[in-house]
A protein has these predicted regions:
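Conserved alpha-helix/loop element of class I SAM-dependent methyltransferases that forms part
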Residues: 1-10
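Short, well-ordered coil/turn elements that cap or connect secondary structure elements
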Residues: 8, 35, 85-87
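SAM cofactor-binding core of SAM-dependent methyltransferases
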Residues: 11-71
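S-adenosyl-L-methionine
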Residues: 56-102
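Conserved small/polar residues in nucleotide/adenosyl-binding loops
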Residues: 104-106
Length: 106
């Protein structure tokens, strides 16, 4: 992880567009390797269907032992904070970020 995170024990991440879940998956793997607590929030207006996400082979190419985690990232409920591991929590918001921001006057 970049030097700006040296000495940090916890990081909050905001991702705009969950998409295939690759960024979330890579961040999860780093959190486990580095022992760093990550609170990961992602907004997605158009989630991919299970038919598509089940065909993604990122775990097989990157971390075969974590295939079940990749599946969990896609299967966990939207709009609920989920502890994927003791070091990684995920909040997937099925929402239009532009509408959300307008509601809080940003």
């Amino acid at each position: 992880m970049p030097g700006i995170f040296i000495g940090k024990k916890e990081i909050n991440v905001l991702e705009i567009g969950f998409g295939t879940g690759l960024n979330t998956f890579l961040t999860f793997l780093e959190s486990q390797e580095k022992g760093l607590r990550i609170n990961y929030t992602t907004f997605e207006l158009y989630p991919l269907s299970p038919d598509i996400t089940e065909k993604l082979n990122y775990p097989a190419l990157i971390a075969p032992s974590s295939e079940s985690i990749f599946a969990l990232l896609h299967q966990c409920e939207w709009n609920q904070k989920i502890a994927i591991s003791p070091l990684f929590t995920l909040y997937k918001s099925h929402a239009d970020l532009t509408r959300t921001l307008s509601l809080i006057h940003i």
